[in-house]
């Protein structure tokens, strides 16, 4: 179960920090805050998705990006992305190994989170944390699109919202 006493920065409509609040207060009062999503590509070119643990307080057991999480109080987006890769997948990344793909303003689909989406390559062994992740799967981008269209209810709302932007950005590279 997530620690409801975690503290996050509260931000305004322009993503500037204006205060801080506990996780429970942020979610109970729908306050604007920050999050990251990281999409990890394997050496063979597949993208890793994770199925969220049943212990998650929001959207348990749904498929989402390789790893994701809130930006903690005083933490930057990039630092948060690197931390989440370590905590959820056991991947130790350095700044030069992770790249920002796009930014998403807060909306209901992201749970009032300003989101930065990153990509990285899994150069080491992926070891999912059982407290965070039930299972992982490796798919090509086109396979993700087919699966998402076929059974959207199996995917977290933030993933459903972010995927079209991700697909567009990655198709341009």
What role is predicted for each listed range?
Residues 29-31, 58-63, 139-140:
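A short, polar/proline- and glycine-enriched secondary-structure boundary/capping micro-motif
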Residues 48-49, 66-99:
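The catalytic Nudix box helix
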């Amino acid at each position: 179960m997530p620690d409801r006493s975690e503290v996050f920065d509260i931000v305004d409509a322009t993503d500037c920090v204006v205060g801080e609040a506990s996780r429970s207060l942020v979610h109970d009062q729908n306050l604007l805050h920050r999050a990251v999503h990281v999409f990890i590509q394997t050496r063979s070119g597949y993208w890793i998705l994770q199925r969220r643990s049943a212990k998650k307080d929001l959207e348990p057991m749904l498929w989402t990006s390789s790893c994701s999480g809130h930006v903690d109080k005083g933490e930057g987006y990039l630092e948060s992305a690197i931390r989440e890769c370590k905590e959820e997948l056991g991947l130790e990344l350095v700044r030069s190994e992770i790249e920002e793909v796009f930014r998403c303003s807060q909306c209901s689909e992201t749970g009032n989170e300003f989101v930065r989406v990153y990509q990285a390559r899994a150069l080491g062994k992926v070891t999912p944390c059982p407290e965070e992740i039930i299972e992982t799967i490796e798919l090509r981008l086109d396979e993700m699109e087919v699966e998402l269209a076929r059974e959207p209810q199996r995917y977290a709302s933030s993933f459903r919202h972010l995927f079209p932007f991700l697909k567009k950005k990655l198709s341009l590279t």
